[in-house]
Amino acid sequence: MTAEPATKKIKLELSDPSEPLTQSDVIAFQKEALFRCINRRRVDFEALRKQYELSRRECIDVSRKLANIMALIVTLARFIETFCTDANEKQLCREIAQGDETLIVQRSDSFMKLLTKYGKPNTTDSNTNSNASDHIQELTTELKNLRKSKEELFYENSQLTEEISALKEYYTNIIRKYDRDESFTIKRVFKEDKTDAVKELREDEKESNENNIKSGNKDSSAINGDNTSKKSEKGDELVQAEDERKEDAENEKLELDLKFSDLRAEINSLSSTIKDLENIRRENEEELIKTRSEVSNLKKQQIAAADQDPDFKSYDHESLLAKIQHLTEQNAELSEINSSFLSKFQVLAKEKEIYTKKVREEFQKSLDSLVEMNSSLEKDVVRIRTARDDLLSKIAILEAEKSKTEVLSDLQHAIDILKEQWTKIDQRSNDTKSSSTQDALIKEIQDLEKGFRELSDLTHKKYSEIINHESVISKLTVEKTKADQKYFAAMRSKDSILIEIKTLSKSLSKSNELILQLKDSDRLLQQKIGNLHKQLDLSQNNERRLIDSSKTETLKIIDLNNTSTKLKRSLEKLQEESNKSIADMTHLETKLNDTEIELKHFKQKASHLESKCEKLHDTLFRGNNKNKGSSDEALVEELANFRTLVYCSLCSKNWKNMAIKTCGHVFCENCCKERLAARMRKCPTCNKAFSSNDLLTVHL
């Protein structure tokens, strides 16, 4: 039953079952009774806690589902509001769109009619109409089936709950019985161990008797001295067992006779009481018929008096009550209108806040996105510019290298021309054989060498000058390209800045437009709020007027009630006197009937008890003749111990039914209450303090 581990039972030091009860046995019995009561309370608490957890989870699920359904209904109402043409239908949709549960439940029928009205398709296409009608019929059949299943499930649920409650009671009774069966103190007090031992002895005697009979039948053929002695001993045992059986049978017969006589006496008393009650019922029915006829005659007399006296109708209590009810209904309607206006005002204020928040968030998002785009574009421009500068510098270097290669190619061409001339001169010198010509040629060659050297010096100088000039030109060109690059970069940055300025101006204009729109919406909302305030003032004025009118009406009603009460007092006095006399008569009659029934019951009881006492006297007289008088002292002592166990130790009159939680001692309820009333708030046995909250009812 519980999630806690089973508590270990304390070993109780009980006295021997053959001996009479002691004070320690009584204390152990009381403690174990308290323990059983606390354990039962703990089990009930654990079951309640589990039920509470389950119901809480189910409540959360139901609330979540209900919220989803409410949101769906609100969206449906808002959607249907766009199609509505009638003002009442729009008003209904708006009221349902507010999301008030009580309003939705009240206006559910009208809202369902709206849904069926606007849920139908147009009459243009016949196929769609037929499909829609089929679909609606299917939905209606499904709805009917669902309702049937709901009713069946509800009936099954009720049956299951009844079965669960019955099972719970059954298992709690079983647990209680199991706890009582397991307790050693109950066995010790009510002598269950002795009865068990007696039963075991009887079963052993029966088995031994059967075995003896079988062995006697088997050994009847053998004739020995030892067998005869054994048979004699077994015969004595059989005689004793038969005597005990006879005594048990007589006791059982006596108990059954007593029970039968008790039941017969109860049946007789019940039959007599039933007859008396039937007679009383008949008399009451006759009196009821008479009173009803008298009431109908009185009503007829009142109607006739009202027809004769026209002023009598003005004092009609029912009409005044109807007026009061009508005024209260009007007051309730006005309060509902006032609350609806207040809820609308709150909804509009919430919508305004939500709208402003959304606009601010969108504006902030667009601004952040523009800033991010601007930063990314600036990074891209810087990267492109650096790449462009690198490429332009590479191009300038390549152009400078190209000019140097051209100069070298020109020099190589001049050297080739000089080599050709030199080869031609060598050929000419080989062709000429004369010495004169050779000398002239040598002189010419020397002159040519000088001229060549001078030319080569001049060419070298000019070459160096050209190289210097070209290096200066290349440096100037590089600087010019750099300046051009800087100029173009500045122009491009100017273009990008102009583009950024344009985009920012566009965003600024958009933000200004948004601000203007927000201002317009704010103005409209303020106008709506002002209108709502005016409507509120009007409704409050109407409410005040109605309250004043209701006050005047109530004053009139009070005056009329006073006049009616004055007129009714005389009637009430007469009716009270008649009712008192009737009540006294009926009270005396009921007392007479009760006393007669009790007399009969007591006479039957007395006769039954006399017969019972005679039977018990006879049985006791027979038993005392057989048994000795030594067992009487033990019985008296055991009865005294049982009285100390069951009856209160303070008054020794009432049963013990109230335990003190602080110490565990048990007394009767009257003694505990008397001690608390006399401010004696200490236990009489152990002097421990206790209060009214420490008392616990116990059933021993």
Swiss-Prot record:
Segments forming a coiled coil: 126-406, 555-620
Subunit structure: Forms a complex with the E2 enzyme RAD6/UBC2. May interact with LGE1.
MF-aspect GO terms: DNA replication origin binding; identical protein binding; scaffold protein binding; ubiquitin protein ligase activity; zinc ion binding
Organism, scientific name: Saccharomyces cerevisiae (strain ATCC 204508 / S288c) (Baker's yeast)
Reaction(s) catalysed by this chain's protein: S-ubiquitinyl-[E2 ubiquitin-conjugating enzyme]-L-cysteine + [acceptor protein]-L-lysine = [E2 ubiquitin-conjugating enzyme]-L-cysteine + N(6)-ubiquitinyl-[acceptor protein]-L-lysine
Protein name: E3 ubiquitin-protein ligase BRE1
Biased composition (Basic and acidic residues): 200-209, 228-250
One Pfam family recorded for the sequence: BRE1
BP GO annotations: double-strand break repair via homologous recombination; meiotic DNA double-strand break formation; mitotic G1 DNA damage checkpoint signaling; mitotic intra-S DNA damage checkpoint signaling; protein ubiquitination; regulation of DNA-templated DNA replication initiation; subtelomeric heterochromatin formation; telomere maintenance via recombination
Cited SMART domains: RING
